[in-house]
Amino acid sequence: MPAKPVLYLIDGSSQMYRAFHAPVRTGEGSLLRNAQGLPTNAVYIFVTMLRKLLKEHAPQYIAASFDLPGRTFRDDLAADYKANRAPMPGDLAAQIPLVHRACEALGVPIVTQERYEADDVIGTLTVRALAKGFDVAIVTGDKDFFQLVDDRVRVFNPRDDGTWYDAVGVKEKFGVAPEQVVDVLALMGDTIDNVKGVPGIGEKGARDLISTHGTLDALLANAAQVPQKKYREALLNHADEARSSRELLRIHTDIAVDIDVATLNYRGPSREDCYRLFSEMGFRTLVNEYAPDARNTASDYALITTS
């Protein structure tokens, strides 16, 4: 029986952010920049990651998703959602359109949706892909995506020694089954996104409570019987915060994205677009590889074929 096709879905925003903060510097310790002074470190690391993924995994189907500027439905649910986040560094903001260009030049389509985050786009594409007979690989370092893992959905973290997480891996890494992840996150909260959670309950406590009670709803229904006084009082006093936090942290899988996953087949890079972009960035090795007179090699992913 032939293997199912696999759709690779790249969490572009988180990968770009991690690329920006990766230790890629010039000899003087400053950010990598091109000849015009434009920062290029996030572009360089993102491109390196993406090219490695394309070369080593040869995906037949692939897409990337990025957060869009502006409000999302989560801002409507909680006015202070992400209120603690510092403004995006200007050196990162300047690289966003360049990372988008890199995806397009390398042949990776970008899928986004107004008022939703990349997480929800990826969640929706995942469910659609499963319905069409695909398996799914989510490329991210964000533990929130563990909630989507099942026997046909895995998470691949290119920064974590290229680790794959299936349901067993999620349990080993996070301490609970994938379907329990969002309940643990709801108790913990998220300081970066200003999701409150339940005060006084950290990751270990959240894991233990959900492991014992199975679900957040069951835990809250039996909060008065929780033996630890600290947890019992916190759950009784902050049940609404736990539920609202779960709604903020749950990845939506049914949003109105106008795309057929079957059209996300990988067609390879545009050598001309790659050459132009990498020349602007000053990535000399890549410029040489995609130069008009360069010979096609095994690293030219346009040669990938499907049967």
Feature names for model-found ranges:
Residues 1-4, 58-63, 150-154, 158, ...:
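Non-catalytic nucleic-acid-binding/docking modules located in mid-to-C-terminal regions
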Residues 2-139, 143-168, 241-258, 263:
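Noncatalytic, basic helical substrate-engagement surface that gates or grips nucleic-acid strands
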Residues 23-26, 79, 87, 272, ...:
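A generic structural signal for solvent-exposed, polar alpha-helical segments
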Residues 111-121, 290-307:
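Charged, flexible boundary elements
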